[in-house]
Structure formats: C-alpha cells, structure tokens
From Swiss-Prot:
Quaternary structure and partners: Homotetramer.
Name used for this protein in its record: Glucose-1-phosphate adenylyltransferase
Gene name linked to the record: glgC
Similarity field: Belongs to the bacterial/plant glucose-1-phosphate adenylyltransferase family.
Keyword match Nucleotidyltransferase: yes
EC number: 2.7.7.27
Keyword Transferase attached: yes
Binding site for alpha-D-glucose 1-phosphate: 114, 179, 194-195, 212
PROSITE patterns: ADP_GLC_PYROPHOSPH_1, ADP_GLC_PYROPHOSPH_2
Reactions mediated catalytically: alpha-D-glucose 1-phosphate + ATP + H(+) = ADP-alpha-D-glucose + diphosphate
Protein's organism: Klebsiella pneumoniae subsp. pneumoniae (strain ATCC 700721 / MGH 78578)
HAMAP family noted in UniProt: GlgC
C-alpha cells in the first residue's frame, strides 16, 4: 500500500478521509434500555431533544470529511432506515458520496443472522470491497461523542499501523464492560482482553483501566484478509473485541489512539466526552445533562454541527391557561411544536410536539416526541416513551412501590413509561 508523506498533516487530513469508508455497526438491540428498544434499534433511539443516537456517528463522519458510509443494520431496522432516508439523503452520487444501508440478508451462512460484530462486516464484504477504499473506519452506532476521525487516520498512517484502536481511561470498577488493553511507550498494543472479570490497572493510575471504545481504523486489504480467515475459523465468535483485535495484537500490528487527541470539544480543558447510553439511568442522565447550565457535551458548537432529520415545526409555545397560570420552564430543552400550558417544567428534555396541559409539574423528566400530558400530573425522574398519553392526575416518580407495580423502575429509581404499560392499566392511548 502506498503511504502518504508524513510531513504534511494538512494534506493528510484532507486526503485520508477521501481514501476511507466508514462502517457504522447499527444492528444492536440495546436490551439494557428495556422497553425503550422493543420497537426500535438502539441507534434509532431519540436523544438530546431532536436527534437520534446514530446522528452523532454520522455527523462525525461528515465533519471529518468521510462521505462514503455504510450503515450495517439488523434488529428492528425500519425506524432507523426511515430516519436515514429522510435525514441523510443529501449526498452527491457524482462525487462518489453515499450512505449505504446494509441490512442482514443471510447471504453467507444461510440460516444465520450476524454472529458477531466482525461477522456483520464479513457478510457484507462483497459490497464493501467495491468501495475500493484504502482505509476502513469501524464505528459503533450507539455512542454519544464528537470525534474528528481524520486525526485518528493521521495517527494510524504516521505510526505505520495495520489496525488502530481508539481508547480512553475508565474507572477500573467499570472496565469489565469494555475491551481492556496495555500499551508500550510507542502506544503499540501489547495485550488486549475483552471484558475481563479482573481488569488490569493502568501503570500510571491504579484506579483506571485503558479501555477500547469500539472505534477502529484498518488498512482495508488487511481487514478483508483477517475477516475471511476468521470466517473459516469454526471456533471463533466472529467478534472484533473477542477475536480480531486480540489476534492483531499477538501479531504486533495494533496500535492505540488516545481519544483526547481527536475528541472535539469547545473547552480544551474539559474532560473528553464519550458516553455509552446503554442503560436507562445513563440515557436519562445524559439527556438531562444537556439541559444543565454548563453541559459536558456542547451541542451549540457551529464548527462541529450534529445533523439530523429536520421536521417543519412551529416554535415551542408557553401560554397561560384560563385560570391565569403561566407555562414556565427552567434549565430545560424544549423542542419545536411543544405547547406548555399553565404548567412548570424544570430540568427536563421535551422532544418535538409534546403537549403539557394545565397544573402539571414536570421535574427531571425526558419526554419523547408526541407525548400528551393530561392536567394536574406530576412527573419526576422518568422517561416517557413516544406518543404516550398520560392521563389526568397521574403521579410518576414519587412512590417507588407504585412505580414498580405499574411501570419499569430501575435500581437507581428511574421510571420508564410506555404506551403498552399504560394500556395494561386501562388508559386509552388514542386522543
């Protein structure tokens, strides 16, 4: 493979994304989000008032200069496919730009869907190889972060790596959920273990482990060779973290890329932001953080915009009811099409077309699109799924036993409410 000159970072930053294709793994079920992902894949879950989770990986690609993207789907893909078709159809075929949807089609192994993350790429190799890319960027479609992939590509080329893994320190008590690595002084990965029961600590900080973020850069030809070999191995689980990365590490061809080098943030002194919103509490907390005075993730950075499907909606409206009570909000995100009538909304996130009727108190709540809240309701520490109709006078988040009986309540006390749960309680969901 022809290597670009290493003494011109600006040239590398322009050329490497053009020579690359990004593959976003977007087929995950997200079972830890409970009923929130029964009817949609985790990357299609709403986030941040107007976005879907996958919008962050897609926006990172566009902002990094990568305009050849494959989205690999599987579980409950309709909502995700519809969102991408509606919101990400602005690419130019004449310029060889595209977002290619790659659903599981059981072409390779007949009876099998994707057997692992690596197999998801393997089953689409006949399509991916036609992209004729020199580099392949593998991404998870279910994380919240801002990253300039061109900087990671530069790091990959300058180190002469065949595979580069983005990494960041995590608390050692949380590291069992990740692939954990050890690196030498040149950032070559010398050991890699997927989800170890006893994660090794970093030599420089015994309270942290160096974790893989599930973001990889490969030399394309090398990746295809590895995947074809892995596909023939009956003992493999066909997973990047469990099989592919450890094998490359043993061969001495894998390098680490510290996430702070490519993390995009407005405040250079802030901690690099990357979240796996895989649990209900993490999802709720990450949404509410955006409504705080100084959120950890800057959504207002015009130099690194997060794109999404834009609906034609009127502005949010706050009105007083007939009794004279004013609609008020504080430290909240309220999206287009919302109407707050004679109620108070505090430290909450309201997605498009939410209607809050009179005498309600909404505190620390996430209300997904088209939620209707009847009069005199009190909602606290909860996530209300799309199009739920909350009946008049309902109280959520104040009585742990009652919440657990009627809805799903996490160990941390976050309550998830869906239309099916409300129907089982006898509440009609049509209005």
């Amino acid at each position: 493979m022809v290597r670009l000159e290493k003494n011109d970072p600006l040239m590398l930053a322009r050329q490497l994304p053009i020579k690359s294709v990004a593959l976003i793994l977007a087929g995950g079920r997200g079972t830890r989000l409970k009923d929130l992902t029964i009817k949609r894949a985790k990357p299609a879950v709403h986030f941040g008032g107007k976005f879907r989770i996958i919008d962050f990986a897609l926006s990172n690609c566009i902002n990094s200069g990568i305009r050849r993207i494959g989205v690999i789907t599987q579980y409950q893909s309709h909502t995700l496919v519809q969102h991408i078709q509606r919101g990400w159809s602005f690419f130019s075929e004449e310029m060889n730009e595209f977002v290619d949807l790659l659903p599981a089609q059981q072409r390779v192994h007949g009876e099998n869907w994707y057997r692992g993350t690596a197999d998801a790429v393997t089953q689409n190799l006949d399509i991916i190889s036609r992209y004729k890319a020199e580099y392949v960027v593998i991404l998870a479609g279910d994380h919240i972060y801002k990253q300039d992939y061109s900087r990671m590509l530069i790091d990959h080329v300058e180190k002469g790596a065949r595979c580069t893994v983005a990494c960041m320190p995590v608390p050692i008590e949380e590291a069992s959920a990740f692939g954990v690595m050890a690196v030498d002084e040149n950032e070559k990965i010398i050991e890699f273990v997927e989800k170890p029961a006893n994660p090794p600590a970093m030599p420089t900080d015994p309270t942290k482990s160096l974790a893989s973020m599930g973001i990889y850069v490969f030399d394309a030809a090398y990746l295809y060779e590895l995947l074809e070999e892995d596909d023939r191995n009956e003992n493999s689980s066909h997973d990047f973290g469990k099989d592919i990365i450890p094998k490359i590490t043993e061969a001495g061809m894998a390098y680490a890329h510290p996430f702070p080098l490519s993390c995009v943030q407005s405040d250079p002194n802030a901690e690099p932001y990357w979240r796996d919103v895989g649990t209900l509490e993490a999802y709720w907390k990450a949404n509410l953080d955006l409504a705080s005075v100084t959120p950890e993730l800057d959504m207002y950075d015009q130099n690194w915009p997060i794109r999404t499907h834009m609906e034609s909606l009127p502005p949010a409206k706050f009105v007083q009811d007939r009794s004279g009570s004013h609609g008020m909000t504080l430290n909240s995100l309220v999206s287009g099409g919302c109407i707050i009538s004679g109620s108070v909304v505090v430290q909450s996130v309201l997605f498009p077309r939410v209607r809050v009727n009179s005498f309600c108190n909404i505190d620390s709540a996430v209300l997904l699109p088209d939620v209707w809240v009847g009069r005199s309701c009190r909602l606290r520490r909860c996530v209300i799924d799309r199009a739920c109709v909350i009946p008049e006078g309902m109280v959520i988040g104040e009585n742990a036993e009652e919440d657990a009986r009627r809805f799903y309540r996490s160990e941390e006390g976050i309550v998830l409410v869906t239309r099916d749960m409300l129907r089982k309680l006898g509440h009609k969901q049509e209005r």
